[in-house]
Amino acid sequence: MGIFVVIEGIDGAGKSTQAKLLAKWFEKKGYEVILTKEPTDTAFGKLIRKLVLTGGREGIIDGARISHEAEALLFAADRAEHVHKLIKPALESGKVVISDRYFYSSLAYQWARGLDLQWLIDLNRFAVRPDLVVLLDLPVKESMRRINGRSIKTEFDKIVELQKRVRENYLKLAEMFPEIRIVNAQNSIEDIHRDIVGLVEQEILSGI
């Protein structure tokens, strides 16, 4: 089997940057790496990206609203394709898979939108559990500063409140799932990368 690492965190935490740096680190060590993300680039993923842009309200597609439950099911459908067509085959062939977000994002965000946590967990039971989940923890105030230049289509105060709930949920999930390790995302990019590499060496490579 291969190695499966997930990078999680609220918006602006630096997930994509750290996922790319970790992929390069593994490649330098001679591993074959698959760098992926959720939502994916499949039809499901593209549909979800349209939903995500609407923020904390119910998703809107072509003017029609869908419920948070329907949104959660779309995320799960996209994830099922992701797991069965990319993640499982890559791991079975001995590759390293690094994912920018995974089902923990669904738990944190959709729980913050009022859905039942246990229902969300049950909905994602098919998902392969990673060897390590790096939670890049960042205060919401800093998150908002970092993403201020991005295109935001919802009211600022609603985004702040949602991100606060999501951050709280991530920290609660870290107490529930032993594979989650917290890294301070306020540090420099280099220091964060060093912390992540340390976790990979300690939690995964030391046992190989």
From Swiss-Prot:
It catalyses: dTMP + ATP = dTDP + ADP. Its EC number is 2.7.4.9. GO terms for biological process: dTDP biosynthetic process; dTTP biosynthetic process; dUDP biosynthetic process. CDD domains: TMPK. Keywords: ATP-binding, Kinase, Nucleotide biosynthesis, Nucleotide-binding, Transferase. SUPFAM superfamilies: P-loop containing nucleoside triphosphate hydrolases. GO terms for molecular function: ATP binding; dTMP kinase activity. It comes from the Archaea. One of its GO terms (cellular component) is cytoplasm. Gene3D superfamilies: P-loop containing nucleotide triphosphate hydrolases (3.40.50.300). InterPro entries: P-loop_NTPase, Thymidylate_kin-like_dom, Thymidylate_kin_CS, Thymidylate_kinase. It holds the Pfam family Thymidylate_kin. ATP binds at residues 9-16. Belongs to the thymidylate kinase family. This is Probable thymidylate kinase. It comes from Thermococcus gammatolerans (strain DSM 15229 / JCM 11827 / EJ3). The gene is tmk.
